[in-house]
């Protein structure tokens, strides 16, 4: 279980195949017992700077694959991450409270989020007060997963300045291309998110899903609410052959989403049209959606 802590100017992590489900490992090499309940991350970078990971293949992780935590200046290049479609919590790459991250030329197909950007959960994230910011995701391919690019739901330190460009996505088991999720306990902000030049063959859910009332198991519920502000989202230059839905956006009544722009979409076939509510300033420009059923529900 590779864990790097407080490493700087780390040499390349060079090409190799890493698998985490080896059978019959000698007892002295086992990290967790067969009946243990804790599923370990595959690779964690904690408080690290200037790390370059290139050309590795990671398979069958029991939990998140690559987890940069409170780290900066990380490049992840030409990485392949594969986990079964039905394997829970096997996120591909999860930058958390990290900045200046580049993820490029990589292939991810997993049982949960392909890339999930986080910054801590509830009080832990607020006390840490370290956003994830300045993240570039470029020229990547996503297949199975709950989302291609996901922000949240653990974002209580904030997420800002994310650029996703020139990516390909295709699988009926990929449930969203871009997803943002939070709830009334997370707080903080999501702002300045751009996704552009995305090619999608088939996707099993909406191209964009934003949910500010995401219901997850909460252990820190209090009477005090912490609403998340979500501002300045641009999704442009989208080519798609089939999507289950164009977009599904549920903003918060208490703090509506502001400034969403969808521009230059060409979607050949969608099943359920579009739905959105609780948005201030939604701009649609040059949007072509060819729907089978009801086209729109706007509230």
Whereabouts are the PLM-identified features?
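Extracellular/periplasmic carbohydrate-active domains that bind, remodel
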Residues: 1-299
């Amino acid at each position: 279980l590779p864990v790097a802590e407080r490493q700087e100017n780390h040499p390349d992590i060079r090409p190799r195949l890493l698998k985490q489900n080896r059978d019959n490992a000698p007892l002295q090499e086992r990290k967790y017992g067969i009946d243990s309940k804790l599923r370990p991350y595959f690779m964690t970078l904690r408080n690290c700077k200037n790390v370059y990971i290139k050309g590795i293949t990671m398979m069958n992780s029991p939990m998140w694959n690559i987890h940069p935590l409170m780290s900066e200046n990380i490049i992840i290049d030409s990485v392949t991450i594969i986990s079964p479609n039905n394997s829970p919590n096997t996120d591909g790459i999860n930058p958390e409270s990290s900045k200046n991250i580049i993820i490029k030329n990589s292939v991810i197909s997993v049982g949960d989020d392909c890339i999930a950007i986080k910054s801590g959960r509830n009080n832990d994230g607020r006390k840490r007060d370290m956003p994830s910011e300045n993240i570039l995701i470029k020229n990547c391919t996503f297949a199975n997963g709950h989302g291609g690019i996901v922000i949240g739901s653990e974002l209580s330190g904030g997420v800002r300045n994310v650029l996703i460009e020139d990516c390909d996505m295709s699988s009926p088991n990929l449930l969203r291309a871009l997803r943002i999720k939070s709830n009334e306990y997370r707080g903080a902000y999501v702002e300045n998110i751009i996704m552009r030049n995305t090619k999608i063959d088939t996707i099993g859910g909406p191209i964009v899903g934003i949910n500010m009332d995401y219901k997850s198991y909460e252990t820190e519920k209090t009477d005090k609410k912490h609403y998340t502000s979500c501002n300045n989202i641009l999704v442009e230059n989208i080519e798609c052959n089939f999507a289950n839905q164009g977009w599904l956006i549920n903003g918060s009544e208490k703090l509506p989403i502001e400034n969403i722009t969808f521009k230059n979409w060409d979607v050949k076939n969608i099943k359920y049209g579009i739905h959105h509510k609780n948005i201030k300033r939604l701009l649609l420009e040059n949007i072509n959606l060819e729907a089978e059923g009801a086209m729109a529900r706007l509230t």
